[in-house]
Design a protein with these regions (language model features):
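Gram-negative bacterial Sec-dependent N-terminal signal peptides
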Residues: 1-22
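Flexible, glycine-rich linker and terminal segments associated
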Residues: 24-59, 67, 81, 86, ...
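Short, contiguous acidic and Ser/Thr-rich linear segments
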Residues: 68-80
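Extracytoplasmic assembly/pore-lining segments of large envelope/extracellular complexes
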Residues: 296-304
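Outer-membrane beta-barrel transmembrane domain signature of Gram-negative proteins
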Residues: 342-360, 364
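Beta-propeller domains
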Residues: 372-385, 400
Length: 826
């Protein structure tokens, strides 16, 4: 919301009481939030629809869709203000009026029978144009010409955690994890780095560089170029870590209806637990979570198709592991939409000493509403693979079928030729609200080899495990090599209103040359009763040795709140309980309380009490998170009769740009530097703990590339004397861009002055106040009170008293202005 300034208060009060003057004199509300500094004003208007003459940076909307920010010069007669041919084209408006040779159209000519409205208070201009003259855009989509490259900047997003456990029976253990996602943006190019450090107990720590590449998006290609260390796509072939070059279509550049999905990791923690997610042998995510359900949706994954290995380490040292399938949905594209991907370089597979050069290419094309064709090839030293597939959008759901042929010649002369076939299915049944998120089955012949298989096989005989290797070759041959059948499925069902929803997931695999198979099933039911929410979850897992593990969990959460958010802050606390059963019956129970406190809701806390049936052990724990403007700090502690556990982490970001160095609560891949000079402690988009610093700068993450991002500053809690001229901005950045969003402010010192004419009569409401140079610096408000803004105390000011005769009076000040004094205008 906008901050109510003294001037705004005076004008609003006057409008309620002086109707006669309002009919003659109008006041531009732009002036209420700062006005047009240092410009002389002859007639002040109280009319949002007719801005004062001058230059404005305006957000333009066409039929309620944002079409970008433009610089507009409003003429003395606003009706003569016009837009150029280039701007109109970027707005997506087709106009026959250009046929007459005009290079600039007035707003009346532009709307062609429609209308336009100003909202100068938020620097917005709306055109309502007949739809036949407008190029239609999908809601939220921004055309490429309005994407922003951003500024030159260096940044790093960091996460540092320390996890300590002390067990009476086995001693203590300590793990340290550090991750940096860094970038250097220069002249529209972006250098990205993802590196981590891991250390356990007394073992020497090891640094790992997961990715390091140079990137640039190209709007003409609707694609992105990368050069360096990265991963190939997993749309057609398995993802491969490599060093080289990759050019691919960035589907996020397209409207939302033409894009893909990202994975979601969820589970239930029984205590203050450490959740670790690995992909391709790299730790891609690690975070402490409090007891209860958790859902991780903000994964930043460098490689696409590798499954996610999830481990949940409880405070007592027990570890639960499970696998989240990460495969693309059936390769269906909208009619006329194509998707390309080209990569060339040398494999850089972790732990392998012998690497291989390769070239990979893939292409998909949507022919019509029914058919999508796709294919790809991968060629390397003594290896090749070709894939052809088709996707069908049928009334029974989306189905894709593909076949891959591979040829692998090993260094020892062994030759393997094989085939792999896959069928995948995706369907939402609207009549029953049933969603088959992904059901996929793949069969591979005994001699089928992926490129990863080919490289690993050439490293098998001379492999020597390094104790710092995250991924052992034995792990690969245990989990990935020689797969025969693989089946995965996810299904969710919404029940009739009030009955909740059910979800089911399954994963089944078997291998050539090995007996047995691995199976994993998960079933959950969730619902709400009044304000109480609950989840029933069951899981069953089998490994190849026919070992079975069963779990059943009941989770319930009850909210309690108080405060009306007017006289007292609104507060809410949650009481939760989680009970788990296993093959032996009752296994554990956890009861907890959690909530948010602080004047800016910056503290999240939780306390819990748990009981483990095995060992008859009771544990008490607590956790606290501080969302500070410059970092996020977390701490946890648990203790029982047999162990103690403590954990701490700090995360945030550092941004260096031409305006200085700023700290951030957190950073994402794409973010904004918001600059409102002189405005301190204003918060962004309702996040009260994310505030501007003393220079008026705040870093805001979570920007969505190629989309409208609405940014709003709330100065209601700011004590700054500077005034904000418009508190809302819109930005549409390229992926990975650092966007500078400038807010216009007036940092001149405000003064509220009481004054009368020499005859004791009040000064005329609404008349301007000018300095000795004739520049407008304020206005006369209600009750003959003046509001002015100046950098220094003026020696005197002039106030108009009779415009028709050109009469004015002067108020003289000394070295300072006394706001408690009554001045005389002579």
């Amino acid at each position: 919301m906008l901050r109510i300034t003294p001037l705004a208060s005076a004008i609003v009060a006057l409008l309620l009481g002086i109707e006669a003057y309002a009919a003659e004199e109008t006041f531009d509300t732009h002036f209420m939030i700062g006005g047009m500094k240092d410009q002389q004003v002859a007639n002040i208007r109280l009319d949002d629809n007719q801005p004062l003459p001058g230059q404005y940076d305006i957000d333009i909307y066409v039929n309620k869709q944002w079409r970008g920010k433009y610089e507009i010069i409003v003429k003395d007669n606003p009706q003569e203000t016009c837009l150029s041919r280039e701007v109109i084209k970027r707005l997506g408006i087709n106009s026959d009026n250009f046929a007459s040779g005009k290079q600039c159209l007035t707003f009346e000519q532009l709307v062609q029978g429609g209308s336009y409205t100003w909202d100068i208070g938020v620097f917005r201009l709306d055109f309502s144009v007949p739809q036949a003259w407008v190029e239609e855009l999908e809601s939220g989509y921004v055309p490429p010409e309005n994407w922003e490259r951003g500024i030159n900047a260096f940044y790093t997003s960091y996460y540092v955690s320390q996890y300590y456990s002390d067990y009476k029976a086995s001693g203590n253990s300590k793990s340290t994890y550090v991750r940096f996602n860094s970038g250097l943006n220069l002249l529209g190019w972006q250098l990205h780095s993802d590196a981590s450090f891991s250390k356990t107990n007394n073992n020497p720590g090891v640094w790992k560089s997961n990715t390091l590449y140079l990137e640039r998006g190209f709007a003409q290609l609707l694609g992105t170029l990368r050069v360096g260390d990265m991963y190939t796509s997993s749309d057609i072939f398995d993802s491969v870590r490599f060093s080289g070059v990759r050019l691919f279509r960035d589907m996020q550049m397209l409207p939302n209806s033409k894009q893909n999905f990202t994975p979601r990791v969820q589970g239930i923690a029984q205590s203050n637990a450490l959740v670790t997610i690995e992909q391709n042998g790299f730790v891609v995510y690690q975070k402490e979570v409090p007891p209860g359900p958790f859902a991780i949706t903000d994964l930043q994954l460098a490689g696409g198709g590798a499954d996610l290995d999830v481990s949940v380490k409880e405070a007592d040292g027990s570890v639960t592991t499970y696998l989240v399938p990460y495969a693309a949905v059936p390769n269906m594209l909208q009619p006329g939409v194509s998707k390309y991907d080209f990569a060339a370089g040398r494999s850089h597979i972790e732990g392998a000493s012998k690497q291989s050069d390769f070239v990979q290419a893939g292409y998909q094309y949507g022919f019509n509403n029914l058919l999508t064709l796709y294919g790809g090839s991968m060629v390397a030293n003594n290896y090749y693979a070709f894939t052809l597939g088709t996707g069908w959008n049928t009334r029974f759901g989306a189905i894709s079928v593909d076949a891959t042929k591979s040829h692998s010649k090993q260094d020892n002369g062994d030759v393997f030729d094989g085939q792999s076939y896959q069928i995948a299915y995706n369907k939402f049944v609207s009549q029953t609200s049933t969603r088959f998120g992904l059901a996929a089955w793949r069969y591979s012949s005994r001699d089928y080899r992926t490129f990863n298989d080919h490289v690993w096989a050439n490293n098998k005989d001379n492999y020597r495990r390094d104790e710092n290797d995250v991924y052992d070759i034995a792990d690969y041959y245990q989990n990935d090599f020689g797969r025969k059948n693989s089946f995965s499925a996810n299904m969710s069902q919404s029940l009739p209103e009030g009955w909740g929803s059910v979800s089911l997931s399954t994963l089944w695999r078997d291998y050539w040359g090995r007996s047995g198979s691995s199976k994993d099933y998960q079933l959950s039911y969730s619902n709400n009763w009044r304000r109480i929410s609950y989840i029933l979850a069951a899981s069953q897992a089998y490994d190849e040795n026919h070992h079975e593990e069963k779990r059943f969990n009941i989770f319930i959460s009850i909210p309690f709140d108080w405060g009306d958010d007017v006289t007292t802050p609104r507060r809410q606390i949650y009481m939760s309980n989680s009970t788990t059963f296993d093959d032996q019956g009752f296994a554990s129970n956890n009861t907890g309380l959690s909530g948010t406190v602080g004047s800016r809701d910056q503290f999240n806390y939780g306390v819990n009490l748990s009981y483990q049936n095995q060992g008859n052990e009771t544990t008490a724990g607590a956790n606290l998170t501080w969302n500070a403007p410059v970092a996020t700090v977390n701490g946890s502690y648990s203790q029982s009769s047999t162990y103690r556990q403590a954990g701490a982490s700090v995360s945030g970001g550092i941004v260096a740009w031409s305006g200085g160095v700023n700290l951030a609560n957190r950073l994402s891949e794409t973010f904004a530097v918001m600059n409102a000079p002189g405005i301190k402690d204003a918060y962004v988009n309702g996040q009260k703990y994310r505030t501007t610093n003393r220079n008026g700068v705040v870093v805001y993450d979570g920007m969505t590339p190629y989309r409208e991002n609405h940014l709003m500053l709330d100065v209601s809690q700011s004590d700054s004397e500077a005034e904000l001229r418009g508190n809302r901005k819109i930005a549409a950045p390229y992926r990975g861009a650092v966007v500078l969003v400038n807010f216009d402010t007036d940092q001149r010192k405000p003064w509220f002055i009481k004054a009368l004419r020499a005859d004791g009569q009040p000064l005329m409401f609404g008349y301007e106040v000018n300095d000795i140079h004739g520049h407008n610096i304020g206005v006369v408000g209600q009750g003959s009170q003046l509001f002015i803004r100046t950098n220094e105390v003026p020696p005197s000011v002039n106030v108009a008293i009779d415009k028709q005769q050109g009469l004015s009076c002067t108020i003289t000040f000394g070295k300072e202005i006394d706001e408690s004094r009554n001045y005389i205008c002579q």
